[in-house]
């Protein structure tokens, strides 16, 4: 087995390698003067089971091209089986047509990864689970609910006043999965209506949050506007405190400042996307590593063991 890392999140790749007690494969992923991507694999991978670790986060197009070219290089070097390990799958929010003459970019990206030579995809908490069906190759979508539940138990006392909250109707299934792992905690839903692109307006809270310690749970925090508005609404409805757990911390623009100035007690995100300097500097943002989860999935795939047992 070989592990290869792109440039999008080398600290996570190194952490996964440490979990598996093996080194990263020597490779050079660099750019020419015109920013074309060039990849050289510096070790023999003929007949090997190779895992390429690369989130397609910002800059999404550059990191996607790196991934595709790495896969192509490995295929031409006679790698036996190539698994694209994509902790954060960019373009996942473009999973359907939202109007006339608009693309389904998530499907296009799935086609590109497949045609580049990948034999399998391993990802985590897709924005929409049905994106798995966009791939014509085996695709495993890891769920972070166990990882998050373990962290919550370490940092928050369990009790009847603990409540899991979905920041929108679309995330109810995700939030319910976390609630079940927290002694079947109560569930609430924030009904929000977007007032424009990149903006959100909280309208209503479904569930009684008065005097409850609320845990918001979602897959992506981009501008963090949804989270901060939801937290404000929960506090206005009598919540005792509000924390947030997010799988993918995109945290673009002024997101870190927005979190710092919000009523959130803290925002906990995985390291599926490498932390930006503003995120590292924000006292309310804390990272929990997904390396053990991804590393264990890689080990199971390489040994032909069940990956679904990780969801039990």
Curated annotation (Swiss-Prot):
Keyword Transferase: yes
Binding residues for ATP: 34-36, 93-94
Pathway of action: Metabolic intermediate biosynthesis; 5-phospho-alpha-D-ribose 1-diphosphate biosynthesis; 5-phospho-alpha-D-ribose 1-diphosphate from D-ribose 5-phosphate (route I): step 1/1
Cofactor detail note: Binds 2 Mg(2+) ions per subunit.
Residues annotated as binding Mg(2+) 1: 127
E.C. numbers: 2.7.6.1
Gene3D superfamilies listed in its UniProt record: 3.40.50.2020
GO terms assigned for molecular function: ATP binding; kinase activity; magnesium ion binding; ribose phosphate diphosphokinase activity
Catalysed reactions, semicolon-separated: D-ribose 5-phosphate + ATP = 5-phospho-alpha-D-ribose 1-diphosphate + AMP + H(+)
Catalytic-site annotation from UniProt: 192
Subcellular location field: Cytoplasm
GO CC, alphabetical: cytoplasm; ribose phosphate diphosphokinase complex
Cofactor(s) listed: Mg(2+)
Binding locations of Mg(2+) 2: 168
Binding annotation for D-ribose 5-phosphate: 194, 218, 222-226
GO biological process: 5-phosphoribose 1-diphosphate biosynthetic process; purine nucleotide biosynthetic process; ribonucleoside monophosphate biosynthetic process
Top-level EC class: transferase
Keywords: ATP-binding, Cytoplasm, Kinase, Magnesium, Metal-binding, Nucleotide biosynthesis, Nucleotide-binding, Transferase
Quaternary context: Homohexamer.
Entries under PANTHER family matching the protein: RIBOSE-PHOSPHATE DIPHOSPHOKINASE FAMILY MEMBER, RIBOSE-PHOSPHATE PYROPHOSPHOKINASE 1, CHLOROPLASTIC
Role: Involved in the biosynthesis of the central metabolite phospho-alpha-D-ribosyl-1-pyrophosphate (PRPP) via the transfer of pyrophosphoryl group from ATP to 1-hydroxyl of ribose-5-phosphate (Rib-5-P).
Stated family: Belongs to the ribose-phosphate pyrophosphokinase family. Class I subfamily.
The protein's name in its UniProt record: Ribose-phosphate pyrophosphokinase
């Amino acid at each position: 087995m070989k592990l290869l890392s792109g440039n999008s999140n080398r600290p996570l790749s190194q952490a996964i390698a440490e979990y598996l007690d093996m080194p990263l494969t020597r490779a050079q992923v660099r750019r020419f003067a015109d920013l074309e991507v060039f990849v050289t694999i510096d070790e023999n991978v003929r007949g090997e089971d190779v895992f390429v670790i690369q989130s397609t986060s910002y800059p999404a197009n550059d990191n996607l091209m790196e991934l595709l070219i790495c896969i192509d290089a490995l295929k031409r070097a006679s790698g036996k089986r190539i698994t694209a390990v994509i902790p954060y799958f960019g373009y996942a929010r473009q999973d359907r047509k939202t109007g006339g003459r608009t693309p389904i970019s998530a499907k296009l990206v799935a086609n590109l990864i497949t045609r580049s030579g990948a034999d399998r995809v391993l990802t985590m908490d897709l924005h929409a689970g049905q994106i798995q069906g966009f791939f014509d190759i085996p695709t495993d979508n890891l769920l972070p609910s166990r990882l998050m539940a373990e962290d919550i138990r370490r940092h928050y006392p369990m009790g009847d006043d603990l409540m899991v909250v979905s920041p929108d109707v679309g995330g109810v299934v995700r939030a319910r999965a976390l609630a079940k792992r927290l002694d079947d905690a109560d569930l609430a839903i924030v009904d929000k209506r977007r007032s424009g692109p990149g903006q959100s307006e909280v309208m209503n809270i479904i569930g009684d949050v008065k005097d409850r310690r609320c845990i918001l749970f979602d897959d992506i925090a981009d501008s963090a506007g949804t989270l901060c508005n939801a937290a404000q609404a929960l506090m206005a409805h009598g919540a005792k405190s509000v924390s947030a757990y997010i799988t993918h911390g995109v945290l673009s623009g002024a997101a870190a400042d927005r979190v710092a100035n919000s009523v959130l007690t803290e925002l906990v995100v995985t390291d599926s996307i490498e932390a930006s300097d503003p995120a590292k500097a924000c006292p309310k943002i804390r990272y929990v590593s997904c390396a053990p989860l991804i590393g264990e999935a890689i080990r199971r795939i390489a040994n032909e063991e069940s990956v679904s047992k990780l969801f039990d």
